[in-house]
């Protein structure tokens, strides 16, 4: 599985997800977007931004989704198999920030920092 497919599969296990550059015009909330940034062995940690988008007046659904992602990554991170190795995802710092849309108070966003270490040959 390619790096892109591995990340897509992982984030899809949390909720409907799209690479930030590939959100379709007909996408409906809730969904998450993630930065698709790659590296390889010895490239160090790479920062990935995850944004979760919701249409709700409550904080319950956004907070539950952040918690689901946090548990999926775990305390020591999670290693996702891909071609030629694994992607080691870890919680970034700060972990999650709550944001609202200035034009629509029912749109809630969670801005989440994730780090990825590509333990891959290429």
What are these regions (language model features)?
Residues 1-18, 26, 33-122:
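Charged, amphipathic alpha-helical segments and their flanking helix caps
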